């Protein structure tokens, strides 16, 4: 059986899928609170930058992969309007349910779909914009997922990948202390789950750096790939176009 990484552990691919699912079933109910605590609210600025770069317009078709609690889907639905089509998707039922309920509470009615990014159930050349925020690092076959995202994009459509990345070297030691000491403490204190937030720190370290992810997107067939470092490289937004 093929091996892969779950944080720093080496596990079978099927076991990773189960473990990742377990993490997000566990954190779903506290996801928004923990995002605010862990990032000091910065995740809102990172998402706002992504929304601005996506430049969704009335009538656009948008696929929000790993949509979680629906921050991007909410913004895109407002911009795409009644003539547009925004799909809020996630592979995790608990996250999808929390996101769906949150969108409804905000008065946003948009399709919600349980979706594996490695097997996207849409035809070729369908979407104007595809986004994945803080989801790619949890995927087992990132290359397959990126290829699928490209497949469903229309010509001239764009893929935006917002993800934790490699922090600038002068901040690395402090960031390591925060990641491996503070994050698990916050998880234990506010969500009664230190292990899930320890996995978060480990999964960030195992994720490809900015240049490697840029190359992966190019190898998936995307063109004009560029990235923006946010908060000293704690997060990066990669953007690629299908020509």
UniProtKB/Swiss-Prot annotation:
Q: Which domain of life is it from?
A: Bacteria
Family matches, as SUPFAM superfamilies: S-adenosyl-L-methionine-dependent methyltransferases
> Which Pfam families is this protein grouped with?
Ubie_methyltran
UniProt pathway annotation? Quinol/quinone metabolism; menaquinone biosynthesis; menaquinol from 1,4-dihydroxy-2-naphthoate: step 2/2; Cofactor biosynthesis; ubiquinone biosynthesis
**GO MF annotations, alphabetized:** 2-methoxy-6-polyprenyl-1,4-benzoquinol methyltransferase activity; demethylmenaquinone methyltransferase activity
- Give UniProt keywords alphabetically: Menaquinone biosynthesis, Methyltransferase, S-adenosyl-L-methionine, Transferase, Ubiquinone biosynthesis
- Give its E.C. classification number: 2.1.1.163, 2.1.1.201
Q: What Gene Ontology biological process does one annotation of this record name?
A: menaquinone biosynthetic process
Which reaction does this chain catalyze? Answer: a 2-demethylmenaquinol + S-adenosyl-L-methionine = a menaquinol + S-adenosyl-L-homocysteine + H(+); a 2-methoxy-6-(all-trans-polyprenyl)benzene-1,4-diol + S-adenosyl-L-methionine = a 5-methoxy-2-methyl-3-(all-trans-polyprenyl)benzene-1,4-diol + S-adenosyl-L-homocysteine + H(+)
Q: Where does S-adenosyl-L-methionine bind?
A: 69, 90, 116-117
Q: Does the keyword S-adenosyl-L-methionine apply?
A: yes
This chain's function reads:
Methyltransferase required for the conversion of demethylmenaquinol (DMKH2) to menaquinol (MKH2) and the conversion of 2-polyprenyl-6-methoxy-1,4-benzoquinol (DDMQH2) to 2-polyprenyl-3-methyl-6-methoxy-1,4-benzoquinol (DMQH2).
Name the family the entry cites. Answer: Belongs to the class I-like SAM-binding methyltransferase superfamily. MenG/UbiE family.
> HAMAP family, per this entry?
MenG_UbiE_methyltr
What is the designated name of this protein?
Ubiquinone/menaquinone biosynthesis C-methyltransferase UbiE
Q: Which organism is it from?
A: Paraburkholderia phymatum (strain DSM 17167 / CIP 108236 / LMG 21445 / STM815) (Burkholderia phymatum)
What gene name is listed for this protein? ubiE
């Amino acid at each position: 059986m093929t091996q892969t990484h779950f944080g720093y552990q080496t596990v079978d691919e099927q076991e990773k899928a189960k473990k990742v699912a377990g993490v997000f079933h566990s954190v779903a109910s506290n996801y928004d609170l923990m995002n605010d605590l862990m990032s000091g609210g910065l995740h809102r600025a990172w998402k706002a930058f992504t929304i601005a770069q996506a430049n969704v317009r009335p009538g656009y078709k948008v696929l929000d992969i790993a949509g979680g609690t629906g921050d991007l889907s909410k913004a895109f639905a407002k911009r795409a309007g009644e003539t547009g089509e925004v799909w809020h998707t996630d592979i995790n039922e608990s996250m999808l349910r929390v996101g769906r309920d949150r969108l409804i509470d905000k008065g946003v009615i948009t399709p919600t779909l349980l979706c594996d990014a490695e097997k996207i159930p849409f035809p070729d050349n369908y979407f104007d914009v595809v986004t994945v925020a803080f989801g790619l690092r949890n995927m087992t076959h990132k290359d397959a997922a990126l290829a699928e995202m490209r497949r469903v994009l229309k010509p001239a459509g764009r893929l935006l990948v917002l993800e934790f990345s490699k922090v600038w070297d002068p901040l690395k030691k402090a960031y390591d202390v925060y990641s491996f000491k503070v994050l698990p403490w916050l998880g234990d204190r506010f969500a009664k789950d230190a292990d899930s937030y320890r996995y978060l720190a480990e999964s960030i370290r195992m994720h490809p750096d900015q240049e490697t992810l840029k190359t992966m997107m190019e190898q998936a067939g995307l063109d004009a790939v560029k990235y923006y470092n946010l908060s000293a490289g704690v997060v990066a937004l990669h953007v690629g176009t299908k020509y």
